[in-house]
Structure formats: C-alpha cells, structure tokens
C-alpha cells in the first residue's frame, strides 16, 4: 500500500510523497524491476521511473492511472463551483510547494521518456481517470506501451477483474 493508505502509516499522500516512497523502496530493497500501480500510484510510478535508471527489462503495469492531474483539478473546481481566482491561487500553491506547475504531474508527459515495457489497463467508463486523458497517449503509438482497454469495469472493478489479472500475469511471464 501507499503511504497513508490501507495498513500503511502516515496521514498524508500526494504524488511526490508516493514517488519518493517508490525511490526509497527501490534504493533500500531493490532493485525493483516490476511494478503494478493503480490510480495515483500510476502517476507516482511514472514520476519515479522518470528519475530512475531503468531499461526495457523493467515492466510497469498502470491500472487506471491518474493520467492528467489537471483533469482531476478541473473536476474538483467544477464540482465545488469555485471561480478562476481560487483556481489560480491553487495552481500557484502547487507550484510553490512542489516546484512544478500542475500540468507537470502527468503520466502522458512522462510516457515518451519511459524505457520500460508498460501494460496500461484502462476502462472506457472510468469516471475518476477518464479515457479521454489516455487517448492522446494511445494515438502516439509508443512501441513500449501496450494498452488493454476494457468497458464497464470503471475505476475500481478493473483491478479485480479476472481477465485483467490474467493479462497482467501474461505480461509478467518470462
């Protein structure tokens, strides 16, 4: 589990904390060459792998990754009916705290620099991490990324689905 998730300790999580955790595990218990991630874990893994020395022997599984942080922020601001001034302050705070603008937190941005083989599982009906964020990555046809697109599983059932599990096992098989 990620920090502050499940049985893990901690009270706060964000993509940078999670990415740092991945680096810590890799440095102290690794090298880790195979990863499975879901949702924000996919974003954190992409940010971590971007800084890690790795090659095509590494294998990454993204299950419904939080592809574009901007999309999540847009949804939140729309849901809360907050105006553009609050959004500008929010974006500024993110950049002040992290050193990066919100759009930097993007799996799509990192995708071309990943050398590892990637299995990217995503559902067409995902209401948390929409397929529309993934489509530009699919269109790029990166040779190291294999997409497995499902329909009707949404954001959480996708990682419990037996066909998805089988696809992941096949991907990791020698």
Question: What residue spans do the PLM features occupy?
Answer:
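Hydrolase active-site cap/lid region
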Residues: 52-98
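Short alpha-helix in the alpha/beta-hydrolase fold that links the catalytic acid
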Residues: 116, 130-139
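Acidic catalytic loop of the alpha/beta-hydrolase fold
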Residues: 124-129, 156
């Amino acid at each position: 589990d990620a920090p502050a998730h499940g049985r893990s300790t901690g009270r706060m999580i964000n993509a940078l904390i999670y990415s740092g955790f991945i680096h810590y595990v890799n440095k102290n218990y690794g090298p880790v060459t195979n990863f499975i991630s879901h949702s924000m874990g996919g974003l954190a893994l992409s940010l971590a792998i971007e800084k890690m020395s790795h090659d095509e022997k590494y294998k990454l599984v993204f299950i419904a990754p939080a592809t574009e942080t901007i999309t999540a922020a847009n949804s939140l601001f729309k849901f809360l009916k907050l105006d553009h001034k609050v959004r500008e302050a929010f974006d500024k705070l993110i950049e002040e705290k992290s050193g990066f603008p919100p759009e930097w937190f993007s799996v799509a941005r990192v995708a071309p620099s990943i050398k590892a083989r990637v299995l990217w599982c995503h559902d067409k009906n995902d209401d948390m991490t929409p397929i529309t964020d993934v489509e530009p990555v699919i269109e790029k046809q990166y040779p190291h990324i294999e997409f497995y697109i499902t329909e009707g599983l949404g954001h959480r059932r996708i990682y419990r689905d037996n066909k998805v599990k089988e696809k992941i096992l096949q991907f990791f098989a020698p």
